[in-house]
Structures are given as structure tokens and as C-alpha cells.
């Protein structure tokens, strides 16, 4: 009695000998196969053997173990002629090894997200690597920590601080892109000196001066400072408290906006105002953060001893800092709003009131 065909595995390695299909056509057909377990990743490689025959090698990674009882299930069909291509089907003991083999000639195409495998057929099972691979594939920091707590308890206890910090970086969500409710053209009473500063300094990196000039804008609340500053392009917005973590601060921004921060307590005063490059910020509970820098900063403030940068720099103890600041920043005082109220919607006041700019 013939032996029944059955493979139960999470990773499948398929080889199609003498297969004339393109890798794109093969991938398209494999993606359409209906399985009870989701396909997380497919890699298709085309290889020419020494005799000139084309072969296809395929790695398929499923979300969970998939049981295949039909040895014709993975057959491919030629779209141009009545030809079927039947593969050799194996369970991949190490998807890492198979993936390396499939990629060796560089002629491949893939779909989905490759799942990390801690095992290697050459090195045997590595339980610690398996645990970390499973954690990386989990999709979130909390799930990853739970996996490591269960499967790598020693590391969980002794290295929790490092694990937590590293997983924050690995699973950090993409920064939300701020969309201004107003176009910069909505601000129709912007002084010429502000317009000129923007034209020279708020530009993409290739057009930006090596050491751009920052600007300090002082004025009463509800003059449109914040909304105008945030309408100019991709920026980092720091209000009240400076958070330079990757969750908030982007090294790809065109400029910074520092809003309503008392200059007496502004950390990295010179780094921001001087558009300095490649500097570090020490965090209280984490590793130092590397800031690429080289971008200008817009400082927004109200008049008064705890807000005004002019008043702060006029203090006798800050005379040398003032001399430096005058070479690195433009100082502008607003006496009128940057907009004509007839052109602004009702959100202007509410936003300005929130930021107290």
C-alpha cells in the first residue's frame, strides 16, 4: 500500500525542476492558493542549471503550521500552454538556511514580511535564538516581552532595562505627519523679514545652508505665531518640554519649532539655535540619543521675564551668550497678527489658546 503524502510545517521549501514560468507568474499563482493558515512570506528564485534548464526555488512561510495532504496542491500552470509544473515539496527545518540558499544567485522576488528563524540546520536548535526570533515576529513590544518572560526568563530578569529600551526602538510606530489646517498662504500679513528668513532657511537638505540661521519670534498670544510656524514644512514641534526620543523627534525634519519654553531652562540652547550637527542628548532613563542636527529652529515666545529670549539674553550674566546668539539667530517682534481675521477659520483661536503662543 503506497505511503500517504502528508507534510505538517510552518515553512515549506519547494523546487520546480525544468520550470519555464517567470518568477512573477509563479509568485502570482502561489499567492492565490487558498489555505486555512495565512501566508506571511513567499520568496521565489529562478536558477539556471549547468545544462541550461530553468529551475524555480520557493520558500513559503505560514503564520502557523499548515498541513498539506495533496502533493499536487502547489502545482503551477503555464498561462500560455497546457503544461503543469509539479514541485518537490519539503518541510524547511530552517527557513533561514533555505532563504540564504534561495537568495544565492540574486535572481528572486518576494512577497510579505520574512519571519525570523532562530534555528539553523547547520548549527542545530538554538533555544535562546528561537525565543528572540519569536519575540521579533510577535508584532508588538508587550507581546515580545511576554514571550521572553516565558522562554528566556534569565534575560528577562537580568536584562529587562535593555530589552525594554531596545524593543521601544524596534517597535516604535512611525511618526505622525502633522497636517496644518491652513496653507502658509493663509497668513497674509507676514513681515518681509520672516518671508526672507523662510526662503533662505526652511528648505530640503540639499538646498539648505551648511549652518542655517535660526529665528526668535516674540509676540502676544493669538497673533498666529504657532500656526504659521507649523505650516511651513516637515518639522519637529517641541512645546513646554523637550522630548528628543524617536517617538517625537525626527532627524529628517526641515526645521524645529520650540514653543513656549522658558529660555532659562532650555536644554541644548546652543545646539538648537546654532543649528549644530551630530550632537547627543542624554536621557534620564535611556541611552544617549544622537541628533543629526544642521537644521534651523524657530523659537516662539511671549513677552515677559520667564518667556522672552530678548529679556533673558539682556541679563548681565548672559552677555557672552547674547553676543553669540546675535550671530546665529534673527530676532523679530510681532506687533500685529500674521493674518487678517477674515481669512482664518475658527480653529485658529482654539489652537493658539492651547499652545499659548
From Swiss-Prot:
Keyword Lipoprotein tagged: no
Chain residues that bind a divalent metal cation: 47, 55, 57, 105
Pfam families xref list: Gemini_AL1, Gemini_AL1_M
Listed name of the protein: Replication-associated protein
Assembly and oligomerization: Homooligomer. Interacts with the replication enhancer protein (REn). Interacts with host retinoblastoma-related protein 1 (RBR1), and may thereby induce the transcription of host replicative enzymes even if the cell is not dividing anymore. Interacts with host PCNA. Interacts with host SCE1 protein.
Record keywords, A-Z: ATP-binding, Covalent protein-DNA linkage, DNA replication, DNA-binding, Endonuclease, Helicase, Host nucleus, Host-virus interaction, Hydrolase, Metal-binding, Multifunctional enzyme, Nuclease, Nucleotide-binding, Nucleotidyltransferase, Transferase
Comment block on domains: There are 3 rolling circle replication (RCR) motifs. RCR-2 is probably involved in metal coordination. RCR-3 is required for phosphodiester bond cleavage for initiation of RCR.
Subcellular location: Host nucleus
Motif, RCR-2: chain positions: 55-57
Residue span of motif RCR-3: 101-104
Amino-acid positions noted as binding ATP in the UniProt annotation, renumbered to this chain: 219-226
Domain of life: Viruses
Region of interest (Binding to RBR1), residue spans: 141-151
GO CC, alphabetical: host cell nucleus
A GO biological process held by the record: DNA replication
Organism of this sequence: Tomato yellow leaf curl virus (strain Israel) (TYLCV)
Amino acid at each position: 500500500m503506497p505511503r500517504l503524502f502528508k507534510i505538517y510545517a510552518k515553512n515549506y521549501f519547494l523546487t520546480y525542476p525544468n520550470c519555464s514560468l517567470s518568477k512573477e507568474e509563479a509568485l502570482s499563482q502561489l499567492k492565490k492558493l487558498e489555505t486555512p493558515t495565512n501566508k506571511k512570506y513567499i520568496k521565489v528564485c529562478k536558477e539556471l542549471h549547468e545544462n541550461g534548464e530553468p529551475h524555480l526555488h520557493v520558500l513559503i512561510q505560514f503564520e502557523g503550521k499548515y498541513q498539506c495532504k495533496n502533493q499536487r496542491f502547489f502545482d503551477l500552470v503555464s498561462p500560455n500552454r497546457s503544461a503543469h509544473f509539479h514541485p518537490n515539496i519539503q518541510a524547511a527545518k530552517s527557513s533561514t538556511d533555505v532563504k540564504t540558499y534561495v537568495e544565492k544567485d540574486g535572481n528572486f522576488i518576494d512577497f510579505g514580511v520574512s519571519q525570523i528563524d532562530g534555528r539553523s540546520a547547520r548549527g542545530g536548535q538554538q533555544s535562546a535564538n528561537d525565543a528572540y526570533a519569536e519575540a521579533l515576529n510577535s508584532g508588538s513590544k508587550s507581546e515580545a516581552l511576554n514571550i521572553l518572560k516565558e522562554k528566556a526568563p534569565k534575560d528577562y530578569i537580568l536584562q529587562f532595562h535593555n530589552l525594554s529600551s531596545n524593543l521601544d526602538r524596534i517597535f516604535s510606530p512611525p511618526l505622525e505627519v502633522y497636517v496644518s489646517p491652513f496653507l502658509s498662504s493663509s497668513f497674509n500679513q507676514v513681515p518681509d523679514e520672516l518671508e526672507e528668513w523662510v526662503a533662505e532657511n526652511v528648505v530640503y537638505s540639499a538646498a539648505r545652508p551648511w549652518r542655517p540661521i535660526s529665528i526668535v519670534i516674540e509676540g502676544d498670544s493669538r497673533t498666529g505665531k504657532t500656526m504659521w510656524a507649523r505650516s511651513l514644512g516637515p518639522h519637529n514641534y517641541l512645546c513646554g518640554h523637550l522630548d528628543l526620543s524617536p517617538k517625537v523627534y525626527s532627524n529628517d525634519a526641515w526645521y524645529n519649532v520650540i514653543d513656549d519654553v522658558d529660555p532659562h531652562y532650555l536644554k541644548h540652547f546652543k545646539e538648537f539655535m546654532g543649528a549644530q550637527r551630530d550632537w547627543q542628548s542624554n536621557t534620564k532613563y535611556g541611552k544617549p540619543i544622537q541628533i543629526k542636527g544642521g537644521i534651523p529652529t524657530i523659537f516662539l515666545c511671549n513677552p515677559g521675564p520667564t518667556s522672552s529670549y530678548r529679556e533673558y539674553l539682556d541679563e548681565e550674566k548672559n552677555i557672552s551668550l547674547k553676543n553669540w546668539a546675535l550671530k546665529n539667530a534673527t530676532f523679530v517682534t510681532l506687533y500685529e497678527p500674521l493674518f487678517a481675521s477674515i481669512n482664518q477659520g475658527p480653529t485658529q483661536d482654539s489652537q493658539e489658546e492651547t499652545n499659548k503662543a
